Swiss-Prot record:
One of its GO terms (biological process) is anterior/posterior pattern specification. Gene3D superfamilies: Homeodomain-like. Residues 153-212 bind DNA. Keywords: Developmental protein, DNA-binding, Homeobox, Nucleus, Transcription, Transcription regulation. Sequence-specific transcription factor which is part of a developmental regulatory system that provides cells with specific positional identities on the anterior-posterior axis. Pfam families: Homeodomain. It is found in: Nucleus. The keyword DNA-binding applies. Its main location: nucleus. The gene is HOXA6. SUPFAM superfamilies: Homeodomain-like (SSF46689). This is Homeobox protein Hox-A6. The keyword Heme does not apply. A motif (Antp-type hexapeptide) lies at residues 134-139. It comes from Gallus gallus.
Amino acid sequence: MSSYFVNPTFPGSLPAGQDSFLGQIPLYPAGYDALRHFPTSYGASSLQDKTYTSPCFYQQSNTVIACNRASYEYGASCFYSDKEISSASPSGSGKQRGQGDYLHFSPEQQYKSNGVQSKIVNDEGTDRKYTSPVYPWMQRMNSCAGTVYGAHGRRGRQTYTRYQTLELEKEFHFNRYLTRRRRIEIANALCLTERQIKIWFQNRRMKWKKENKFINSTQPGSDETEEKSGE
């Protein structure tokens, strides 16, 4: 019977006085240690130590991991190389590892994932910054920037202050048509754009024409007044 299947608690004896020889057979081959499960915060506190036999078990100071090909150690920021692991057999012995058997990683490689993750967070922050909605009440009215758009992308209606309207009315009283040089001067003085000054004067001229037409239609003609005065 192989030593892997020998149970030390099984009450048995060998004939011809070979009981002393049974104690000399090692339970595990050289180079392998028994795997023990220690109680952790995730398990019960009263766990019994159990021994298991497997062709590939490695016991480390921080973490114990069982596998068929390779074992890894977490906590020391290094891993075992698959090429350095020798295939274990019941009759063979494991290969002892030194410092040269570890794959060391530089801090740049270790924190590479953290850098990528922080970059994604920064990109999301910039996207939210540029895609944030701008409401009409958040826009600055009567600014020299000029164009103000509404909710649906249309140009909003320009509102003028009382001071701006008064100055424009004064200018319209003296000059119904402005040169470009004068238009630029008024725009700079009232903190408006040249386009806004031009549109205001166009609308004001249309209003003035409508008012004059209404006045001429209500007043009697000059010929009728002369006839009445001659009679």
